[in-house]
Structure formats: C-alpha cells, structure tokens
Amino acid sequence: MGILDYNSAVELLQQNQELNDFVGQCSEQLVKKAEGKLNVIFPQTYRDFLLTYGAGNFGSEEIYGIVKEDFDNSGIPDAIWFTLKQRKEVNLPSNLVIIYHTGGEEMFCLDFNRLGKHQEPAVVSYVIGVDLEFQTYEIIANDFGEFLLQRVKMELGIS
C-alpha cells in the first residue's frame, strides 16, 4: 500500500545509510518544473522521494529522479531527461515516466494511465524495441512506494 510501503522503504534507507548515494534534495519549484516538462503530476510518494533524495543509488539499485534543473542536458539517473530522450528516440508513450533501467532492454515506468485508488500510478515494464501494440506493460508494483520497498529489500537480501 503506497505510503506505508514508502515509509517502510525510507526507514530501511535511513537504517542503512552506508549504501545511500543520492543526488540530494530537490526544491518544490524544481519538481513542478519537471512535472510541467513531462506533462504529469507526480504521485505523493514519488514527489517525496524527489524532494528528499532527488535520484541515485541504494547499493546497486539506481532509482531515477531529478539530477539538475537543465533537463535537456542531463544524464542518468535523471528521469526527466531520460524519459524525454526515450519519447523522442523510441516513441515512449507520454503516459510513462522512466524511474528504473534494468540494464538490458527493459525499463520500469510510472504509468499514469493506471492510477490506483490513491491516484498513485502503477509501475510497469516497458521493453525497448518492442512495438507499442505488442507491449504487455507488465505490472511490477502497484505504486512507487511498493516498488521502492521491493528494490530496497532486494538490495538488503530481505524477502
């Protein structure tokens, strides 16, 4: 459940700070600028992640977020830059925002066409190179909180 899972993930992040390598806090103004650039409104859990951590790594788990204000000239792990780049290069649908790259052809995205009861988008899989009509958009997590908790637990070896 979104906020509860998110709070559990944050607690684990705080307990294991030696694994944290995050960009750092973003301002509310920068988050709003990112939303405008992507034409979405971020869910509360992802917004809190951006405001608190920005983007970065927990061990080997890299969560995309906001790196800097210049979204056109940024790089990984900037979710805004990478999403805009993929929209241009591979026709990534505008309802998807990339938050994680598996290292292969698969990316995990917030899907703003699949909102849960608290207006939290599901996290779905998008495979580069697969035509849009053949994408399955497998649900990886019901929301960002669940997704973040999964990734943090995976890094810690907790089931």
State where each predicted segment sits.
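Low-complexity, compositionally biased segments
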Residues: 73, 81, 98, 114-116, ...
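Compositionally biased, low-structure terminal segments
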Residues: 43, 59, 127, 145-148
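A surface-exposed partner-binding patch
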Residues: 1-107, 152-159
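Ampiphathic alpha-helical segments that act as solvent-exposed interaction surfaces
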Residues: 134-158
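Short, intrinsically disordered/low-complexity patches at protein termini
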Residues: 65-68, 82, 131-134, 143-146
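Segments surrounding the PLD/"HKD" phosphodiesterase catalytic module and close analogs
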Residues: 109-139
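N-terminal non-cleavable signal-anchor helices
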Residues: 32, 124-125, 141, 153
